[in-house]
Amino acid sequence: MYLKYFVYVSSVNNLSDARYCSGMFVDYIGFNFDQNSKNKISIDNFKEIKNWINGPKIVAEFGDSSITYIEEFMSKIEVDYLSINYSSEIIKKIDKNCIVNISDKNIMRQNPKFIEENKNKIKLVTIDDFDDSMIDFVKYEGIDIFIESKKSFLDTEKKLKKYDLGLKLSGSNELRPGYKDYNNISDILNEISIPT
């Protein structure tokens, strides 16, 4: 089995999501380390979960965290990429290839050249609320774009095909340890899976 599109699953904070996504051959799994988030994962929990994952690239998601906080965490964990929100100050201080998350298109319009000016440091861009007007500001050679399925998946899939984009999904909390309702993630991953 494989998936029709490249898939990034964000905000994973439990073993159930991580193992399920790994078994479905998603490409990236992101873990929430944002210092401002109530749902951030502990380093110990992350390390325990990471030991069970094989295949996907591992992303540490820092959102709007300070550079001091990011550097402290990056010295304690091993990941393939780190993700930050659209922020020109932080990216200048990061020496690792990173992922940029655009959570609000209005922020992007305030600094439309951000991706272009930092394209040598950016591996991919994730967009929470994509519309067609954004494509010219984010599409550069060597940078993959992943968009979140906020409305109907049918509408999202049209954009995936039209612009050759990847799909961004989000993990959720377990109902209790080891017990998980996968609803949205499993429905979409099953929809885009191709049996081999």
What are these regions (language model features)?
Residues 1-93, 109-196:
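Conserved N-terminal beta1-alpha1 strand-loop-helix module at the mouth
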Residues 96-97:
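Leucine-rich repeat
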